[in-house]
Design a protein with these regions (language model features):
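Short, functional N-terminal and low-complexity linear motifs
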Residues: 1-4, 80-85, 140, 158, ...
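Terminal amphipathic alpha-helical/low-complexity segments used for targeting or macromolecular assembly
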Residues: 1-131, 297-342
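Short, flexible segments with low predicted structural confidence
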Residues: 3-7, 82, 146, 163-164, ...
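Surface-exposed loop/turn and secondary-structure junction residues enriched for glycine/proline
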Residues: 15-18, 27-29, 103, 109, ...
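Extended beta-solenoid/beta-helix repeat architectures
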Residues: 121-220, 235-236, 262, 280-281
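Glycine-rich hexapeptide-repeat left-handed beta-helix
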Residues: 179, 193-342
Length: 342
């Protein structure tokens, strides 16, 4: 099995700026992890931006989800154009699932994906409190309110007076601090979170350790959100939210009423910053309260007040931050940072 995100990768910028679309998280798994679990033995080439709800029921040269071509067998089909032709001729297998067209859809379908992902987990090492499965190595205070459903994974820590509602996943080695209120969200591995979090995905290795609100947002890896940061996820007019598209090089109307922020890898947000509805923050963007309320688009490598971070400082910061979690970026990763800098 191989991935080819060339058609859609720019649609998921800045989230996919330093990694493939297959490495984006929605639910318990990344796109790639889920596809490997279901289709690991196949020879298919996949565009990874979809969540299958079932495996292959029968052999087929082309696979569809939501009417979109998501994969083909290179032994029978020469490429994506021919795969589209096969689909038009009715020579494709439609499977149940969710297809993601754009980055802003990721936090909006958390519960549907999470419900499906739970069916893929071997729950032998878990016990239940209400409708939440808890790994036996997790440390969970019972002085909380667990009215939701979902899964708390291996080595996670839930401190006292935490409220969990809706579908919630807390990833391996992550910490939820006291008095947190989490609704319909995914907290990926090795995160530290606090405050109010609603309909949001934390990809992994990112922190929001203090009070403040984040809603209908996607937080990439190696992001730090300072104390008192408030993210608007609803316009005062209750109108449709526009977001910046790297693909279109301008604002596009999403048709959605609730959208917060979309932060690329290595974003740093200072204390008491106010994030405008539907803000897109490019990789390595560094903003503070002086940038509040934020513009709709904060470009890659932005430095608070209107400057630009040097490439050397960005690489130095990445190595320092990742090193604190025992992760050493390889040359390929550093090269992607250089290429993104331009």
């Amino acid at each position: 099995m191989r991935f080819d995100d060339s058609k859609y990768r720019k649609r998921f910028y800045p989230l996919s700026r330093l990694k493939g679309v297959e490495d984006l998280r929605v639910g318990i798994f990344t796109f790639g992890e889920r596809l490997r679990k279901l289709f690991g033995e196949t020879e298919f080439i996949f565009t990874p931006n979809f969540v299958p709800f079932e495996g292959l029921r029968e052999n087929a040269p082309v696979i569809l989800v939501d009417g979109k071509v998501v994969g083909f067998n290179p032994r029978e089909v020469k490429g994506w154009e021919e795969a589209e032709e096969f689909a038009r001729m009715g020579r494709a297998l439609e499977i149940r699932g969710i297809f993601f067209e754009n980055f802003w859809e990721l936090p909006l379908k958390v519960e549907a994906v999470l419900e499906n992902d739970l069916k893929m987990i071997n729950l032998e090492g878990y016990y239940k409190i209400g409708e939440i499965y808890i790994h036996r190595t997790a440390k969970v205070s019972l002085k909380g309110e667990f009215g939701g459903w979902g899964l708390i994974d291996e080595g996670a820590v839930i401190k006292p007076f935490v409220v969990l509602e809706g579908g919630v996943y807390v990833g391996k080695g992550s910490l939820v601090k006291p008095f947190s209120y989490i609704v319909s969200s995914v907290i990926g591995p090795v995160c530290k979170v606090a405050g109010e979090i609603s309909h949001t995905v934390f990809e992994g290795f990112s922190n929001k350790q203090h009070g403040g609100f984040v809603g209908h947002s996607y937080i990439s890896s190696w992001v730090n959100i300072g104390a008192g940061t408030e993210v608007s996820n609803l316009k005062n007019t209750y109108g449709s939210v526009k977001v910046y598209s790297y693909e279109k090089e301008g604002l596009v109307d999403t048709g959605e009423i609730f959208l917060g922020m979309f932060a690329g890898d290595h974003v740093k947000i200072g204390i008491n910053t106010t994030i405008s509805t539907g803000t897109v923050l490019g990789i390595f963007a560094n903003i503070t309260a002086k940038d509040s309320p934020t513009e709709k688009f904060i470009p890659d490598f932005y430095w608070t007040g209107g400057g630009k971070m040097s490439l050397e400082k960005a690489i130095e910061m990445a190595m320092r931050v990742m090193g604190r979690r025992g992760v050493k970026p390889d040359e390929g990763y550093i090269d992607k940072i250089r290429e993104s800098y331009g």
